[in-house]
Amino acid sequence: MSTQPESASPPVPEPVEGPGPITAGLTSDRDTIRAELATLSTEQVNERHPDLDALSTRELVAAMNEDNRSVPDAIAAVEPEIAEAVEAIVERLRRGGRLVYLGAGTAGRMGILDASEAPPTFGTDPGLIVGLIAGGPGAIQQAVENAEDRDDLGRADLESLSITADDAVVGVSASGRTPYVLGALEYARSIGAITIGLSCNAGSPLARDADIGIEAVVGPELLTGSTRLKAGTAQKLVLNMLSTITMVRLGKTYRNLMVDLLTTNEKLRARAERTVMLATDVDAATAAKTLASVDGWVKAAILVLVTGIAADEAVARLRGGDGSLSAAIAAHAAEDPTGAAPDVH
């Protein structure tokens, strides 16, 4: 018998009342929607495994693994668009803007997942990368009826964040036709924010209407229409690229090391020490002592050990510059080209 109190169960979200206006010529007429869905590659029947329910467990595992192999190829085909999106996001964040993901269902959850990982991984403010889902926080665990059909809700959610022209808004939708997402991007564009549309179908309204369209076409799902599968995987991989490469470009890493991670538990404190050891070739005791002198900031500890400057000066240099450890090390070397420093290679 469970020992969890009944109050621990998540509340059941309330249905969203009434259909809202639909953008981009889409309609709420069911016959028309069926016709639209029939044109989407993600809604087609996967002819490789039409007898899914007749396969053994081992065969199902092999079939699913085989089907997933198309995802990296789909993403490789849109690498130029992903790079363009990253550059646009970096430019906005350097201006003091934010990165906002939004979507419905799986797409919304993928954005929230990626956004939630940024603070512990890169030491960012929780408000820098934000994830929105149609229907609000309750929809993370349970679907909210009709929410994705409301383009006005997408607009309202962005308005609640006081979106500005300095922000980057990424709409995520496997079909590329979700009204909630289209309405949000229409509003974002109207105020000058850069808009990026991530879809898993070619020729989607989302990619067409966004400033930058990314169409990772993964094809029919193993389970017909279940876009939490390949489409969801593709969305997660692309969002990984958008956030991670953006953080690299913003100087939140040193080589391929996490130097702005938040040390909020023992595992992360051990990782911080190991990161300092990898970057500077010092022992664990030295790494721990140096980290303590800079309040656990990995980036500052490495700067102290590489350059030999005092802890407070290292912190001041990083906070006074653009935050790039490589740039801070290079600047110190330019000031004191004959100064000896530990071999960090």
Predicted features by range, described:
Residues 77-92:
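A short, well-structured juxtamembrane/interface segment
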Residues 3-30, 343:
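Intrinsic disorder/low-complexity segments
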Residues 2-3, 23-74, 78:
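Cofactor-/ligand-binding subdomain signature composed of acidic, glycine-rich
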Residues 80, 142-143, 231, 263-265:
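Active-site pocket-shaping loop/turn-to-helix segments
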Residues 42, 63-71, 131-142, 254, ...:
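Gly-rich Lys/Arg/Thr-decorated short loops/hinges at beta-loop-alpha junctions or inter-strand turns
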Residues 246-345:
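Short, amphipathic alpha-helical interaction segments embedded in low-complexity terminal/linker regions
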Residues 99-241, 246-250:
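Glycine-rich phosphate-binding loops that contact phosphosugars or nucleotide phosphates
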